[in-house]
UniProtKB/Swiss-Prot annotation:
Zinc finger (GATA-type): 118-142, 282-306
Encoding gene per record: sre
Protein name: GATA-type transcription factor sre
Ranges of compositional bias, category Polar residues: 9-18, 55-64, 82-93, 508-537
UniProt keyword annotations, A-Z: Coiled coil, Metal-binding, Nucleus, Repeat, Transcription, Transcription regulation, Zinc, Zinc-finger
InterPro entries: Transcription_factor_GATA, Znf_GATA, Znf_NHR/GATA
Induction line: The promoter contains a number of GATA sequences; however, expression occurs in a constitutive fashion and is not regulated by the concentration of iron available to the cells.
The protein's role, per its UniProt record: GATA-type transcription repressor that regulates iron- acquisition genes through specific binding the GATA sequence elements of target promoters in a zinc-dependent manner. Iron acquisition regulation is critical for survival under both iron-limiting conditions (to acquire essential iron) and iron-replete conditions (to limit iron toxicity). Represses the synthesis of siderophores in high iron conditions.
Length: 587
């Protein structure tokens, strides 16, 4: 079997070196005498470094050992620069301490963001790193400020200007091997830390009253509860990391050779070893529960209530206004659908629900929320005239039996539709001749007359009072065109009218339209009359017929004269308008 060329070359080199080894080997030199200098011997080394060096030398082949001895000459007792650089220059305690500090994230340069520093304000920690339009790395606050205002965020708007210098000094103190004390709390300038109170977790009452402990329905989305949990958790993690770093530095510093034991802060280690939960507290009122942490003008951490009070009034909120429980408003959400102002139970056809109390604006509900109020529609439709007044007018209307008989007899031939709304009692009109004729003109019923009864009465109402004894006679007189257009003077109305004249005037005073509907001498009208219903009234009827003819002629003459006067007035008005048109001219 033939060997490869590389293997044969290696074997030849080994044989040559084995034959020439005795000729090359130099005698070992004697160690130099100890000197009075304070420097340690060159070949002396302590700790695991010498052990590692010896292991590496023992692992070398004999040929490499011989080559190493040959490199040393009796006269030159100094090591080569290569070996001098390989020798460690610091103690093992320092080496391990630096690694632990960098691993635990206590140095800002390696704090979870690969040494990122905001190019604008210089901060090293932010929830989100952004980039400026020029490509520089900026923090979340500077990025949002630049996006909103299109200007660089001032460096001292949130933190004092000496923050960067203090961070550098703290980093140098952490790297120094002389001090093994870890920070008790993370460096957050302007923040106040207090021990969390011993309120049992999960004791939040809910219903808009939050104490930050959770446990109630809806606490998963409560900002006050989430804020408290996240802040306390992050502070506890950083505190435990600081305590672990300090405990790891202590035994390693004691193992160092030739070094004095470092000073330890026992109080800080004792406090850090305790399992105490710390939370951020408001600088103004000291509360630890808030849905949003804010900062004042000096950079101090304050709660949401104090921040809003300071922003509104310009002064810090008094401590007496602090409340142990955060009270949230509960807005009344209108019902989904077309009309949110009226509920299904409040339909106009359904009776009003009297058991449900009215929801007025400003009232407090059972769960402690403030009711903003809902405008409810009235169940009954609004009317201009109250129902009781209309009922009183219907009861007090003086309608005679003859008028009612004529009214019912005129509607006997019409078909009856009971379900139709136009035939209801409220929508039907009384006969014209049954209505009472006022002195001048009857005043219409207005809502103002019912709302303010103490107002001054009108002249027509005053004039109606002395003629109350003539109501029975006046309501029988029909409303003719003459009475509407030319009201009679009060002297003629108040004069004495005999019963015979009343009987003569009743059929004659009807208008032609009314006479066509109800004839003057129809059997129904005479049968319904209470005056001429007996056989002994025949002579009176004959005399009344003659008087009626004379009165009708007289009334026709009066009517003719009134129409002539109206025509003359219309002519004058027409002439005045024609003159005005003539003055304006034609186009």
């Amino acid at each position: 079997m033939a060997l490869p060329d590389d293997t044969r070359l290696m074997n030849n080199q080994t044989s040559i070196e084995g034959n020439s080894a005795p000729d090359r080997m130099a005698l070992p030199s004697r160690p130099p005498p100890p000197t009075a200098s304070n420097e340690p011997p060159e070949h002396e080394s302590t700790g695991p470094v010498d052990e590692a060096a010896s292991k590496s030398e023992s692992g070398l082949s004999p040929n490499s050992k011989k080559a190493g001895h040959a490199a040393q000459s009796p006269s030159g007792r100094k090591k080569s620069p290569k070996i001098q650089n390989a020798q460690p220059a610091q103690s093992p305690a320092e080496t391990v301490g630096v690694v632990n500090v960098a691993t635990l994230g206590l140095v800002p340069s390696v704090q979870g963001h690969a040494g990122q520093v905001c190019s604008n304000c210089g901060t090293t920690h932010t929830p989100l790193w952004r980039r400026s339009p020029q490509g520089a790395i900026i923090c979340n606050a500077c990025g949002l400020y630049l996006k909103a205002r299109n200007a660089a965020r001032p460096a001292n708007i949130r933190r004092p200007p000496s923050v960067m210098a203090s961070n550098v000094r703290q980093a140098a103190a952490k790297l120094s091997p002389k001090k093994a004390t870890a920070p008790l709390l993370p460096s957050n300038p302007g923040a106040t830390y207090v021990a969390a109170d011993q309120t049992p977790s999960g004791s939040c009452p809910g219903g808009g009253r939050c104490n930050g402990t959770g446990g109630a329905e809806g606490c998963g989305g409560c900002p006050a509860y989430n804020n408290r949990v996240s802040k306390s958790a992050s502070l506890n993690v950083l505190k435990c990391q600081g305590a672990a770093a300090a405990s790891s530095k202590k035994p390693q510093a004691a193992e160092g050779s030739g070094e004095e034991p470092t000073e330890m802060d026992i109080t800080a280690l004792h406090v850090q070893s305790q399992n105490t939960t710390v939370v951020i507290a408001c600088q103004n009122c000291g509360t630890t529960i808030t849905p949003l942490w804010r900062r004042d003008e000096a950079g101090h951490t304050i709660c949401n209530a104090c921040g809003l009070y300071y922003k509104l009034h310009g002064v810090h909120r008094p401590v007496t206004m602090k409340k142990a429980i955060i009270k949230r408003r509960k807005r009344v959400i209108p019902a989904a659908g077309g009309d949110a102002e009226i509920e299904p139970s409040e339909a106009p056809d359904s009776p009003p629900a009297t058991s449900e109390p009215p929801m007025e604006k400003g009232t407090v509900n059972e769960d402690g929320s403030v009711n903003l109020g809902i405008r409810r529609r009235s169940v009954r439709p609004l009317t201009l005239v109250p129902e009781d007044e209309l009922r009183r007018n219907r009861q007090a209307s003086p309608l005679s039996s003859a008028a009612l008989g004529q009214y019912h007899s005129s509607h006997t031939n019409q078909p009856h539709h009971g379900a139709h709304a136009s035939l209801t009692y409220e929508n039907r009109l009384a006969p014209i001749h049954s209505l009472a004729l006022p002195v001048d003109r009857q005043a219409s019923i207005s809502p103002a007359s019912f709302l303010s009864p103490s107002r001054k009465r009108s002249i027509s109402a005053v004039e109606n009072e002395p003629s109350s004894h003539n109501d029975n006679e006046s309501h029988k007189r029909l409303s003719s065109i003459k009475s509407i257009l030319n009201p009679m003077p009060s002297s003629e109305i108040h004069r004495e009218v005999s019963p015979a004249d009343q009987l003569r005037m009743q059929p004659a005073s009807r208008s032609p339209a009314m006479s066509s509907l109800t004839p003057a001498h129809s059997p129904g009208s005479f049968s319904n009359s209470t005056v001429i219903g007996t056989p002994t009234s025949a002579p009176i009827l004959r005399s009344a017929s003659r008087d009626t003819h004379n009165d009708s002629e007289r009334m026709k003459a009066e009517r003719r004269a009134a129409l002539e006067r109206e025509a003359e007035m219309m002519r004058e008005l027409l002439a005045a308008k024609e003159r005005e048109l003539a003055e304006l001219g034609y186009d």
